[in-house]
Amino acid sequence: MKMFLDVMYDDTKNARKVKSSDYNNEGKYPIIDQGSKLIYGYTDELDGLYTDVPVIIFGDHTRRFKLIEEPFFIGADGTKVLKLRSLAYDYKFIYYYLLHQNIPDTGYNRHFKWVKEIEFPEIAHSIQCSIVKKLELLNNLISTKNELLRSLDVLIKSRFVELFGDIDCNTKNWPIITLENLAELITDGEHSTPKRCNEGIYLLSARNILNHSLKLDDVDYIDETEYSRISKRVIPKAGDILLSCSGSVGRCCVVPLEIKFQLVRSVALIRFKSDITPIFAEYMITSDWFQRQINSLKTASSQANLFQGRIKKLKGFVPDIYLQYEFIKVVNQINKLKFVQIVYN
């Protein structure tokens, strides 16, 4: 194994930074920073253009890696430009290898010190290239599958509009009612800091709430004593709706069967009355119509929030219950197709 600094070096000093105020939507050269998007802006500037490509970009705060193969400028602070020291390693191989390293999340701090502790295997260049080809083939297959899954999601949205109409215009004249009156319970998770442990009962936060599913590969835990204490506030049950209400606001999913967990404050819980079915509620909340309400009511700060008082002011609509059941059948059928694609293809 070879240490990181024997394989790569930090060449950030030779890359010119462009202020965010100088980003353009179009231009000759891309501006790369540590954010989630590959390219965050463009410029027609030439002075300071970094041309010694390829390079690997590392986000010192975000822990993101990017492989850049065309001349570029860098954006905000925290964008590291990493170069290989020799031709013994292939850039794409190193990039894929780095993507699969576990770099600790220490919040909005610098993380490059952890990257410098990474060790690389000593593998013949030809074998590296062979591995890269297989990984790229796999990535293409994954991209094709993901595109199909996205098209199935679009199909669900289309059926939602067909059954319930254009709610912006309320073409079917459904009753429009605040969530405060549609729900029998609206609350959120524990406000004080729970005592966490290494294993036990799930403690969910906003990062664990995705649209239509839970993300449990990066989750905290509490023990039975802490669970009992927090449960005095609320005990989540199957069919409740979970809504992320801090940071990335507005993601939601239905609580599935047979899962025991508690919540922190960044997750809201909505328990609708019997005239609103959970699956319908989930797709109503993720609709563009409802998300616009959320965006208009969430607090504008460095970290957006949408707490109980504002959640109660959000408005839903109440379609015929039999139409809701018909929609549930559609969702279940499409989810079966998704399952087949994920498992067997």
Regions found by a protein language model. Name each.
Residues M1-K37, A124-K133, N140, N146-G189, ...:
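Non-catalytic DNA-recognition/assembly elements of restriction-modification systems
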Residues K2-V53, G75-A76, E180-T193, R207-A238:
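Sequence-specific dsDNA recognition surfaces
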Residues V18-N24, N109-F112, K172-P175, S192-E199, ...:
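Short coil/turn segments at secondary-structure boundaries
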Residues D33-L99, I103-P104, S205, T225-Y227, ...:
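A short beta-sheet element
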Residues F73-K80, D105-S126, C245, K260-A268, ...:
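A short glycine-rich beta-alpha junction/loop motif
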Residues I94, E122, Q128-I131, A281:
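Interdomain signal-transducing alpha-helices
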